[in-house]
Amino acid sequence: MSIVTSQEMFAKAYAGGYAIGAFNVNNMEIIQGITEAAKECNAPVILQVSSGARKYANRTYLVKLVEAAVIETGLPICLHLDHGDSFELCKACVDDGFSSVMIDASSKPFEENVALTRQVVEYAHAHGAVVEAELGTLAGIEDDVKVKAEDSSYTRPEDVQEFVERTGCDSLAIAIGTSHGAYKFKPGTKPQLRFDILEEVSERLPGFPIVLHGSSSVPQEYVQMINEFGGSMPGAIGVPEDQLRQAARLAVCKINIDSDLRLAMTGTIRKYLAEHPAEFDPRKYLGPARENIKQLVKHKIVDVLGCDGKA
């Protein structure tokens, strides 16, 4: 088994009415927690790397860690660049062995988005990789992605068919109300995704895989844990899991999850160090953090995404 593209994963997911989890990775423990969960659930998985994670962990280390996870689990694992902002970055990741890249030109005018996406598609396809593109702009902050609420915009369903046909992209991220980071909705408001947009997009692109970014649910037990042990995250709210389940039953084949993993790791480490103030062995607190990431991912795979047993 080697690193695979998402093409077969998405075809099966679309036909089966479930979604694949795309989890952001930064280090060994996060990769291990995710892939151990996927192995126990016999689930396909996408490990995705932001440009910030690539800088932090070193591009060679990350690729080799993912290759090790493939060997260790025997699972189909897709290695994906999240939010590539240039042709040069996408090309570098394809050259490094990524099987999938995202070119995010969603903030550019439509014609510029088409042109840049097409350029990335031509290079990636020539080298055996697939491409995710984006129409519509999500608000929020996550790594190098910083978009103010007033600069965000829903995807226009009337644009999607032309965009996909002209670019040749393999999947499309759309904006239907999710956002990046841990503060997705204002306290006191009812979170609600625009399923009407999703349904119209899927009607215009039958059988085509749709992607949801910014889909962490922000588990309140970890928010409370962080706040209890020295942190400050008032008003952190995520996407309700029942709405993600609904999206997975429709045309959404890839659901991106990052903040939930960060919360699980940070909350666990804060709690452990507060309860063991004399401890200084990183294995003692990184081990429990890895285990809680594993349990969180198992929950997502089984109870939200529905991709258990689909590897």
Model regions and ranges:
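Long, repeat-rich segments with strong aromatic
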Residues: L212-V218
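Basic/polar N-terminal segments that are highly enriched at the extreme N-terminus
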Residues: M1-V4, A311
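An acidic- and aromatic-residue-enriched active-site/binding cleft used to recognize and process polar
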Residues: G136, S215, D260
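Alpha/beta enzyme core
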Residues: V4-K12, N27-G52, R59-P76, G84-P209, ...
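C-terminal alpha-helical cap/extension of soluble enzyme domains
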Residues: N227-G231, V239-A311
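Terminal accessory/targeting
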Residues: T5, Y14-A22
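Conserved residues at beta->alpha junctions
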Residues: N24-V25, G214
